[in-house]
């Protein structure tokens, strides 16, 4: 595939090059045919460092015209070099990135950085550089500035995607003469430093490389080099050029160019200069000691979001007004300022105009949200993103509570989640933190200033006004996301106090394990009950030694008595008792399965104990439940390797697509999708609406939600091959405590879906009661992530009456017998909460198995002293460099896609072993380095990395991908939404008119709060904010599924909390059930009735917050109408 940008590039790939050729010979040959000085650079790749050339080369010509002539000569077979006919094709990258058009290579410009002052025409100039080189690389979609400072050369790189507006300007007084261009930026630019000494560069004097200019250096990433941290503080770049009018055609091609010319006045910004490494932050000294921290945090957040400028935020009149308000009033007004779509140049005026209306509304607003959040197990959390040059304060945002923050809830504003990210908020790449320097024949890593910046912030903390946030700990998921918890120590509680409260970590001499254990209690969890030490018994682990390797069959599994399990289930808000809970209890971590014969509350094993702790709160992170089962690319890859035909997967996907096909029009089809794909959530409001008689396309709210569900499913099919496996479940693993199961056997009892209850095909089920059955026969079992063919296990699912008596349900019971535990055979899993893919669909059960991989991990390095915080900080930053999980997974998929042996190929087996080491890196501290030889050179079309060399995949992945694309292409275009929304009179309750004014007030409050969430999270419409499914995501979310998943969770939590708050308004406004029906009907009326649609921005979801009440009204009205019709019929007779 050749992209459009490659044709605008002056570089070509030359094939069929003699392997005896050197750069000088190829240069002379090409310039003999094309003319002198027509080659800018060339390189002949070598298999070893500067020897053994390969049979192709890359050549970068000086112009596109020269490139075209060379391609013509090649097509005419006129480039004959020593009997070798040189063949030219498009290259996917330049050797030296530089503009092809010489007019886009500007020298001697003046670059001024700063931000707007009191209006758009006044520019607060922080720093100015003369003699700057500016390259506009349209092909690379970026602008580069080369700046010389204190004898060093730096490159400032601005991506087109980060430019929010481009303007032509006059800065020298003559309004008719354009002499500058202003770039307004969303994010900070990347900064590089030019380095020549001891760095292995691509261009040096050797036999296989040539460059016309002196490029014997390397750019390495660095932090803000300016003494006043002006780059980090700036949001705009102003470029002063000669003859600006003649440059209009070039600069008007930059993103979001505005036609009118701006007369710009520079204002000295020296007062905003800062020597601190964390910028931009308001100078706390001007605020005074009594200024509330919460308001200071929001002012900084507004500056970082570019809702107000740093100049406006420092205005003493604004500070005086905010200081004179109540804290709650000030925060509400600043939240309204966050909702502005563009920068507010006069926040003083904005605050003054909002004061009266906000105070009036607050008199009728409900009490503090703290109780409501606590009931939902939600906490409010401050966030900070730290980039190489800036800081961004965000929030507070809602997320699931953890035990640590909940225990210190009175200090919740002293906690902060800090994430280290790239300038555009994407994952910070390893080469930004470390580069390889060469000394003689040896290569060693050199840490960059960005590495030192992260390490310094972990050690010194972040100061925001009166608070200094210092490192506290990080959980395993935070480590993978380059995030930590920080805490602002105060007179009552210090960060060290919290760590001591969590437990004793001094016995752990491994840095990586010590760090992991510190983060154990930060897992999102629900706090249930205190369990005294005397109510806990220690039970032995079940272990075996096979071929010198030690295995633990009971690794991570314990027991809970039935009586206590009932109490825990009640605390979790469950109406039933699950078979097992995943828990954190003091220093214990794992799963506790219900034991009906136990009289001790908890029975725990040594394998569950990670550190000593005096905490006695039982924290529950999840419990066993019936979860739908899906294939993904990893599982399909291994099943295909083991002999499952491509047609099987294509047929399963076709069934999935067919199921989705009619859900937007057919009620039964919609019910089928919701009940099959939604697991425990199938009895939700949408299902109730469908069962009540609404057609998918007739009710606007129902139609909107079904459409989102439909599009999400199609997207996941296309991007992940997430194909439903009806004959399967995702189940938490438990152990056979009675020792009944033999090696190779499992016990699986599941809650049946509605489709399974209706189906007559029960050959693989043994019915237990009306809702559950035991699976009988062969099952395929694995655990994600899985890369080795041996991760797929085919086991015998059996019925055993003793397990039925124990009540095990919606979990998989593994044996305690054999040479090795089955969970360990599946990707090195254990029983501390791992979830297993289990399917009894004979179409995807292989007839053969490969031996499982040896998952004996590296031994962690032990220190001869207590682990220090400094060592944990260094481990955190080193992990950022060596986290290769994603790269390894992608490489494995690409090699398996192309190699006839698939996942059994040597490269894939090497990558599976590397992946195992990379997974264990967080515990062992031993990184898994990705060899260059295993890195893919081309990528299959289904990965959609079209900026890279791409090929058409002929494997099962390519077939599945193109089948979904074809299905999407055949979809009917969505009908344009009508101005009028269908109004259902059967939802009217007699007397609802008396509640219309109350309903309007509630509707407007809901609309304002939902709009605020939409703006904050970047949701384009109501359906996106309700589901968290963003169609147009920020680039950093599109690249990182983990980050997107986390944000999606926070969005749904925020909406859930808003709905809970709205329910509070509803309950408070009603005295009895009859009034609830009237108010619910009024909610519906002011939202859907055409007479009220245009009053305010109306959201269809508002009345359906009380959907159960509305459906009761509908049912009663339908029943009343039915009785009246019967009565009328009898009268007529």
From Swiss-Prot:
Location of the protein in the cell: Nucleus, Nucleoplasm; Nucleus, Nucleolus; Nucleus
PANTHER family cross-referenced by the UniProt entry: RNA-DEPENDENT RNA POLYMERASE, RNA-DEPENDENT RNA POLYMERASE 2
Keyword Nucleotidyltransferase: yes
Name of the encoding gene: RDR2
Entry's Gene Ontology molecular function annotations: DNA/RNA hybrid binding; metal ion binding; RNA-directed RNA polymerase activity; single-stranded RNA binding
One GO BP: defense response to fungus
Enzymatic reactions: RNA(n) + a ribonucleoside 5'-triphosphate = RNA(n+1) + diphosphate
Statement: the UniProt record of this protein carries the keyword RNA-binding: yes
Phenotype reported upon loss of the gene: Late flowering and absence of siRNAs derived from FWA tandem repeat regions. Loss of de novo methylation. Increased expression of retrotransposon-derived solo long terminal repeat (solo LTR) and SDC due to their derepression; levels are even higher in the double mutant rdr2-1 jmj24-1.
Stated family: Belongs to the RdRP family.
Keyword annotations of the record: Magnesium, Metal-binding, Nucleotidyltransferase, Nucleus, RNA-binding, RNA-directed RNA polymerase, RNA-mediated gene silencing, Transferase
The protein's Enzyme Commission number: 2.7.7.48
Name of the protein in question: RNA-dependent RNA polymerase 2
Other remarks on this protein: RDR2 is non-functional in the absence of associated Pol IV.
GO cellular component annotations of the record: nucleolus; nucleoplasm; nucleus
Residues involved in Mg(2+) binding: 830, 832, 834
Subunit structure, as described in the record: Interacts with NRPD1 and SHH1. Associates with Pol IV complex, forming an interpolymerase channel bridging their active sites, through which the Pol IV-generated transcript is handed over to the RDR2 active site after being backtracked, where it is used as the template for double-stranded RNA (dsRNA) synthesis. Interacts with JMJ24.
């Amino acid at each position: 595939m050749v992209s459009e940008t490659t044709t605008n590039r002056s570089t070509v790939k030359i094939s069929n090059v003699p392997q005896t050729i050197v750069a000088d010979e190829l240069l002379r040959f090409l310039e003999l045919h094309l003319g002198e000085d027509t080659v800018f650079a060339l390189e002949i790749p070598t298999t070893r460092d500067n020897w053994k050339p390969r049979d192709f080369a890359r050549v970068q010509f000086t112009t596109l015209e020269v490139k075209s002539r060379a391609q013509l000569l090649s097509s005419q077979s006129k480039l004959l070099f020593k009997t070798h006919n040189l063949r030219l094709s498009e290259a996917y990258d330049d050797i030296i990135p530089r503009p092809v058009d010489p007019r886009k290579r500007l020298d001697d410009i003046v670059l001024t950085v700063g931000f707007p002052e009191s209006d758009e025409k006044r520019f607060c100039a922080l720093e100015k550089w003369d003699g700057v080189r500016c390259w506009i690389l349209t092909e690379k979609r970026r602008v580069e500035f080369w700046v010389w400072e204190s004898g060093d050369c730096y490159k400032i790189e601005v991506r087109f995607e980060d430019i929010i507006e481009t303007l032509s300007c006059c800065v020298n007084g003559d309004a008719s003469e354009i002499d500058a261009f202003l770039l307004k930026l969303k994010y900070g630019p990347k900064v590089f430093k030019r380095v020549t000494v001891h760095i292995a560069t691509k261009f040096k004097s050797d036999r296989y490389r040539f460059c016309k200019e002196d490029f014997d250096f390397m750019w390495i990433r660095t932090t803000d080099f300016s003494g006043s941290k002006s780059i980090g503080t700036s949001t705009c770049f102003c470029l002063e050029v000669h003859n600006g009018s003649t440059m209009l055609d070039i600069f008007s091609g930059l993103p979001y160019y505005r036609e009118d010319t701006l007369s710009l006045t520079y204002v000295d910004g020296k007062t905003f200069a800062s020597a601190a490494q964390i910028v931009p932050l308001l100078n706390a000294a001007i605020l005074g000691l009594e200024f509330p921290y919460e308001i200071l945090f929001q002012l900084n957040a507004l500056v970082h979001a570019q809702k107000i400028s740093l100049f406006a935020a420092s205005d003493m009149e604004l500070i005086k007004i905010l200081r004179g308000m109540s804290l709650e009033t000030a925060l509400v007004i600043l939240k309204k300022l966050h909702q502005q779509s563009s920068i507010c140049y006069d926040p003083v005026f904005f605050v003054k105009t909002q004061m009266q209306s906000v105070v009036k509304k607050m008199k009728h607003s409900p009490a503090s949200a703290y109780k409501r959040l606590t009931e939902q197990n939600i906490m409010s959390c401050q966030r900070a993103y730290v980039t190489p040059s800036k800081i961004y304060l965000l929030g507070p945002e809602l997320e699931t509570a953890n035990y640590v923050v909940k225990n210190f809830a009175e200090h919740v504003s002293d906690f902060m989640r800090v994430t280290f990210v790239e300038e555009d908020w994407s994952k910070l790449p390893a080469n930004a933190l470390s580069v390889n320097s060469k000394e003689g024949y040896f290569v060693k890593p050199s840490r960059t200033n960005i590495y030192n910046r992260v390490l310094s912030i972990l050690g010194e903390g972040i100061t925001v006004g009166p608070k200094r946030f210092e490192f506290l700990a990080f959980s395993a998921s935070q480590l993978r996301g380059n995030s930590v918890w920080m805490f602002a120590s105060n007179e009552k509680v210090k960060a060290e106090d919290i760590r001591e409260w969590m437990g004793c970590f001094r016995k752990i001499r491994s840095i990586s394990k010590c760090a992991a254990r510190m983060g154990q209690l930060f897992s999102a969890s629900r706090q249930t009950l205190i369990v005294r030490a005397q109510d806990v018994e220690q039970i032995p682990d079940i272990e075996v030694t096979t071929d010198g390797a030690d295995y633990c069959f009971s690794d991570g599994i314990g027991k809970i008595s039935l009586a206590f399990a009932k109490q825990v289930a009640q605390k979790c808000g469950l109406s039933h008792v699950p078979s097992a809970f995943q828990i954190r209890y003091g220093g214990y971590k794992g799963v506790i399965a219900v034991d009906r014969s136990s009289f001790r509350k908890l029975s725990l094993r040594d394998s569950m104990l990670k550190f000593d702790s005096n905490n006695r709160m039982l924290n529950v992170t999840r419990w066993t439940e019936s979860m739908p089962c899906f294939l993904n690319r990893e599982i399909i890859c291994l099943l295909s390797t083991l002999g499952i035909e491509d047609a099987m997967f294509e047929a399963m996907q076709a069934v999935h697509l067919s199921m989705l096909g009619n859900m937007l029009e057919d009620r039964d089809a919609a019910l089928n999708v919701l009940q099959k794909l939604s697991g425990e959530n199938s009895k939700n409001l949408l299902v109730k609406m469908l069962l009540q008689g609404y057609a998918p396309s007739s009710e606007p709210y129902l139609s909107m939600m079904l459409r989102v569900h439909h599009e999400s499913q199609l997207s996941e099919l296309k991007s992940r091959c997430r194909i439903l496996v009806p004959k399967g479940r995702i189940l938490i693993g438990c152990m056979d405590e009675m020792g009944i199961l033999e090696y190779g056997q499992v016990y699986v009892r599941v809650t049946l879906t509605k489709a399974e209850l209706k189906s007559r095909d029960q050959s693989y089920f043994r019915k237990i009661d009306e809702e559950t059955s035991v699976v009988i026969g062969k099952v395929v079992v694995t655990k994600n992530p899985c890369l080795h063919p041996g991760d797929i296990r085919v086991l015998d699912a059996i019925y055993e009456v003793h397990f039925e008596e124990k009540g095990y349900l919606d979990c998989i019971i593994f044996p305690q017998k054999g040479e090795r535990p089955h969970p360990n055979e599946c990707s090195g899993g254990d029983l501390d909460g791992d979830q297993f893919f289990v399917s009894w669909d004979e179409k995807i059960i292989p007839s053969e198995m490969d031996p499982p991989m040896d998952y004996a991990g590296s031994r962690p390095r032990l220190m001869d002293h207590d682990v220090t915080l400094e060592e944990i900080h260094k481990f955190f930053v080193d992990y950022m460099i060596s986290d290769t999980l994603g790269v390894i997974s992608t490489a494995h998929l690409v090699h398996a896609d192309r190699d006839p042996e698939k996942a059994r190929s040597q490269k894939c087996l090497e990558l599976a072993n590397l992946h195992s080491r990379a997974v264990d890196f967080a515990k062992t501290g031993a990184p898994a380095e990705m060899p260059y030889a295993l890195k893919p050179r081309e990528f299959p079309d289904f990965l959609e990395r079209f900026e890279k060399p791409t090929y058409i995949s002929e494997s099962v992945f390519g077939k599945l991908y193109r089948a979904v694309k074809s299905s999407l292409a055949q979809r009917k275009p969505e009908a344009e939404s009508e101005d009028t929304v269908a109004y259902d009179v059967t939802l009217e309750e007699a007397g609802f008119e008396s509640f219309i004014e109350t309903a309007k007030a509630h509707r407007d409050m809901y609309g304002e709060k939902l709009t605020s969430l939409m703006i904050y999270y970047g949701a384009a419409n109501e359906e996106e904010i309700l589901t968290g499914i963003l169609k147009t995501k920020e680039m950093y979310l599109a690249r990182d599924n983990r980050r997107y998943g986390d944000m999606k969770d926070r969005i749904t939590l925020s909406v859930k909390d808003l709905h809970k708050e709205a329910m509070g308004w509803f309950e408070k406004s009603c005295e009895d059930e009859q009034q609830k029906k009237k108010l619910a009907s009024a909610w519906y009326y002011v939202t859907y009735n055409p007479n009220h649609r245009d009053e305010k921005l109306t959201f269809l979801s508002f009345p359906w917050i009380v959907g159960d009440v509305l459906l009761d009204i509908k049912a009663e009205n339908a029943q009343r109408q039915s009785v009246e019709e019967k009565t009328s019929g009898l009268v007529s007779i």
